[in-house]
Every structure is written in structure tokens, then in C-alpha cells.
UniProtKB/Swiss-Prot annotation:
Family in the record: Belongs to the Maf family. YhdE subfamily.
CDD domains documented for this protein: Maf
Keyword Protein transport: no
Pfam family, one: Maf
InterPro entries named among the record's database cross-references: ITPase-like_fam (IPR029001), Maf-like (IPR003697)
UniProt name for this protein: dTTP/UTP pyrophosphatase
Amino acid sequence: MAFPPIILASQSPRRKEILQLSGLSFSTVSIETPEHLDPAESIESNVRRIAEEKAKAAIQSFQNDTRDPVLLGADTVVAIDGRILGKPANAAEALEMLLQLQGRTHEVHTGFALLQSAHLYSECATTEVTLNKMTEEEILHYINTAAPFDKAGSYGIQDPVMACFVSSITGCYYNVMGLPLSRVWMALQKLRS
């Protein structure tokens, strides 16, 4: 049994790259949704809700699609000491975030949602990442060369400079990049059965 058409509701080049690893054919749609974090909700609930909102916003464009596509939405945040580190607005924010992560373990939470017709499934994957200490000079070099402004927590684990400072990871590597592919794959398998 083949998969239904998959539509990735994301502008992230990393999510597209990760989903390509599945070997599945898919298309992408660009959507704009507010990524409002509700302090009354847990981090996990927030990223699941935002992923669901992205999938629901995207399905509006495909209501008359007779192929019955699966919309995939996702949202990723970094958290340390219960505080959420989103995407930095500028180099000063990126520096502040990266200084907080030095020599410490933090969590990367990605919520993803699959929406097909009226069926909605979502979950959250969490990965723990520990970074070695970086000097301020190394951090500034990273910020100036990697442009981490579209990345939660101000870094990409796959970036050449940052890869030198990741001392351990517990959980899914692809989750840290923005999409827990093995969990998405298992959820897609359930949808088609």
C-alpha cells in the first residue's frame, strides 16, 4: 500500500532535507502562522499545538484535493533550565543564547503533526544535547560564519563549526535538526494502515 501524497507545511530547508532522507515523494507549502508560546502550557504541549496549527493552516489550500494528502507541520524549540530559547533576532541575542548553553546539557523539543482529512495526530520528540565550552571568540566566529538566525537556540548541530563542540546527544539527531524522522515515519505507517 502506497503512502498518500505528503505535503510538508514548512519553509525550513533542514526539514525538507530530512524528509528527503525517507525516500518518499512530497511537496512543500509555505504557510505563515503565529508561533505563540503559551506560558501556561508545557514546552511539549506548545510545540505540538504550533505544529498542529501549521498543518491546519496548510490544509486550507488543499480542501478540494481529491488525493487526500497528509499535511505535515512541525515546530522546534531549545530549552535550558525550563526556559525556551527560540530563534535569535540578532547577533547579540544569538551570543546570549549560546553563552547559556556552554558546557551544559539542554533539550531540543520538536512537535510534529500529521493531518489527513479530519484525522489529526501529533506528538513531541525530545533530545538532550551537551555542548563543550566555547570561548566567546569561537562563539562569535560561529555566529559570523553560520548565520544561526533561523535556528532555535541559535545553532545548527549540523553546522561545520558547531559540530566540533557537541560532546553528547541522547535521542534523535534529526530531531535536533528540526524533524524526528523515525517518529514521523512510524506515525505515517500508522496513518496508511
